[in-house]
């Protein structure tokens, strides 16, 4: 947990540009997302993210999935261990300028 995430307990952080760590989180849940949406994404690039500190970390990540399409994913991390990731939700048919919100 970074110093930044320690400061926001319970609330949703401001949007931040995606880092390599955020891309890695997204990549780990990609197979499950593709199974749930019945899609194979040609591109899967994390653009930005917000974090909510709960018992673990709740990541809301905006993904560019190619052809001008975006989606938002919600990934819960750290409930049973730091490496434990759970895809807890997703929103399809999003636009580049759609704000990440709690869902």
From Swiss-Prot:
Under Pfam families, the record lists: Cystatin
User: Quick one: a GO cellular component term?
Assistant: cytoplasm
Protein's cellular compartments:
Cytoplasm
Question: Keywords of this protein's UniProt record, alphabetized?
Answer: Cytoplasm, Protease inhibitor, Thiol protease inhibitor
Q: Which domain of life is it from?
A: Eukaryota
Q: Where is this site: Reactive site?
A: 10
Where can the motif Secondary area of contact be found? 52-56
> Per its UniProt record, what SUPFAM superfamilies does this chain match?
Cystatin/monellin
What is the residue range of the signal peptide feature? none
Per its record, what are the GO molecular function terms?
cysteine-type endopeptidase inhibitor activity; endopeptidase inhibitor activity
Function, in words: This is an intracellular thiol proteinase inhibitor.
Family, according to the entry, reads as follows: Belongs to the cystatin family.
List the PANTHER family hit by this protein, alphabetically: CYSTATIN FAMILY MEMBER (PTHR11414), CYSTATIN-A (PTHR11414:SF20)
Instruction: List the protein's name.
Output: Stefin-2
**Originating organism:** Mus musculus (Mouse)
Highest classification ranks of the organism: Eukaryota, Metazoa, Chordata, Craniata, Vertebrata
Q: Which gene encodes it?
A: Stfa2
